From Swiss-Prot:
Keyword Ribonucleoprotein (UniProt): yes
Similarity comment: Belongs to the universal ribosomal protein uL6 family.
Gene name of this polypeptide: rplF
GO MF annotation terms: rRNA binding; structural constituent of ribosome
Protein keywords: Ribonucleoprotein, Ribosomal protein, RNA-binding, rRNA-binding
Entry protein name: Large ribosomal subunit protein uL6
Entries under HAMAP family matching the protein: Ribosomal_uL6_B (MF_01365_B)
Function: This protein binds to the 23S rRNA, and is important in its secondary structure. It is located near the subunit interface in the base of the L7/L12 stalk, and near the tRNA binding site of the peptidyltransferase center.
Subunit text: Part of the 50S ribosomal subunit.
């Protein structure tokens, strides 16, 4: 039995879960999320909790058990509280600003980089060196954060670039001067 899969998920009174035609739909105060479902697992709702159960004991069913438990858990958390990723920009002259619905990044290239957020993602810049990405879909928030980070990954010698909040960049020593 999957240690993660067998744990019940508390719904709370804000979220509502529905399974119809092989699609899981979770509705909450922040929005609605859908997820296609595989045949190897089923979702049972009882007294304010959701249980993900597997149909048989095949290798694929065991793999899907824990996966779908976490997918449903993330959907419930997304529609009730949402997800946020914070990016920090380090480097002289590196900055970010919002221009209407575009994120304008100055990252030491000869041109500015403009990034438009996909549907369901909200971006804001509280200051010039911080970008906040928020939304209800955890995977999409992480994907957008990774895309923005890929424009200028942190380099190990000076630490310049875009990094996640709390990310530790392993620093390297530069070339030693010869005798």
């Amino acid at each position: 039995m999957s240690r993660i899969g067998k744990m019940p998920i508390a719904i709370g009174n804000e979220a509502k879960i529905e399974v119809k035609g092989g699609i899981i739909t979770v509705t909450g105060p922040k929005g609605v999320l859908d997820q296609p479902m595989v045949e190897e697992v089923r979702i049972v709702e009882e007294d304010g909790k959701v249980l993900v159960q597997r149909i048989n004991d095949s290798k694929r069913a065991r793999a899907m058990h824990g996966l779908y438990r976490m997918l449903v858990s993330n959907m419930i958390q997304g529609v009730t509280t949402g997800f946020t990723r914070k990016l920090e920009i380090a480097g002289v002259g590196f900055r970010a600003e919002m221009k209407s619905d575009l994120l304008a990044l100055t990252l030491g290239y000869s041109h500015m980089i403009y990034f438009k957020a996909p549907e369901g993602i909200k971006m804001e810049t509280p200051d010039q060196v911080t970008v906040l990405i928020s939304g209800i879909d955890k995977a999409l928030v992480g994907q957008v954060a990774a895309k923005i980070r890929s424009f200028r990954k942190p380099e190990p010698y000076r630490g310049k670039g875009i990094k996640y909040e709390g990310e530790i960049i392993r620093r390297k020593e530069g070339k030693a001067a010869g005798k």
